[in-house]
A protein has these predicted regions:
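Short, internal strand/loop/helix patches
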Residues: 121-187, 191
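C-terminal motif of bacterial Sec signal peptides marking the signal peptidase cleavage site
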Residues: 14-18
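Bacterial signal peptide processing site
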Residues: 19-23
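Short active-site neighborhood of thiol/selenol oxidoreductases, capturing the structured segment around
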Residues: 60-84, 88
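N-terminal "domain-start" segment that seeds a small globular fold
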Residues: 25-61, 86
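A short, hydrophobic beta-strand/beta-hairpin element that forms part of a small beta-sheet core
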Residues: 192-205
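Structural microenvironment flanking redox-active thiols in thiol-disulfide oxidoreductases
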Residues: 83-144
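Non-catalytic, surface beta->alpha helical segment in thiol-disulfide oxidoreductase systems
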Residues: 204-224
Length: 226
């Protein structure tokens, strides 16, 4: 793991993590949320990328007024990324149909060289066909991460694969079941938190590793309030 500054919370979220490394659970926010409350509540950011259908996706315009979960990661992340997406999917299943219909889930790749639109779409469909996958040039993705208050992810060292099976890795305990659809054995650093924007277009809470689907589900009705 390499420590890099984050605009949102220099203390609570002061690093990027390489896949295969833990993000420690944090105490519940003082407001009653079940995640971590940023030191400063910021507005929903503005950036334009493209979705897996090749269409321009203006993040602020497309998600305005809706509870929105955002995760920056990559499809060949061995542990944190698939678990985060599975946790969000499980949380949505625990809430009411009305809240579930209002919510949006956006996954932004930090690995544009390997995460093509078909790869990203196939990977996300393991969790939900409704999840939005966003891609772009390295410069566009870097700008989106900075707009969200984090430093851009970068390629890092190798991740061990199973001997004789370069397309498989050993899953850590607690990792959600998932499949990969590209080459393994490498890592890309990324912010290992789920960003949760509310219907008022603010960021009142983020969820690090260790937060459960039930925790996220409990917060969803609050996030959905106008």
């Amino acid at each position: 793991m390499r420590a890099l500054p984050l605009v949102l919370t220099a203390v609570l979220l002061g690093s990027l993590t390489g896949c295969g490394q833990d993000a420690s659970p944090k105490p519940a926010a003082a407001t009653g949320y079940h995640g971590v409350e940023p030191l400063k509540t910021v507005n929903r950011p503005s950036y334009v990328l493209r979705d897996t259908a090749g269409k321009a996706f203006d993040f602020r315009a497309e998600t305005k007024g809706r509870p929105t979960f955002v995760y920056f990661g990559y499809t060949n992340c061995p542990d944190e990324c698939p678990t985060a997406m599975a946790d969000i999917a499980a949380a949505l299943r625990k809430t009411t149909p009305e809240v579930r219909a209002a919510a949006r889930v956006v996954f932004v790749t930090t690995d544009p060289k390997r995460d093509t639109a078909p790869v990203l779409r196939r990977w996300l469909d393991q969790f939900s066909t409704e999840f939005v996958g966003l891609l772009g040039t390295q410069a566009q993705l870097d700008a989106a991460q900075r707009a969200s208050g984090i430093e851009p992810g970068r390629a890092e060292g190798p991740v061990p694969t199973i001997p004789g099976r370069p397309d498989q890795h050993v899953h850590k305990e607690g990792t959600a079941p998932h499949k990969h659809f590209g080459p393994l054995g490498y890592s890309v650093s990324h912010s290992a938190v789920i960003f949760a924007y509310n219907a008022a277009d603010r960021l009142p809470v983020v969820y690090p590793g260790g937060v459960t689907p039930s925790d996220i589900a409990a917060d969803l009705p609050v996030l959905a309030r106008p």
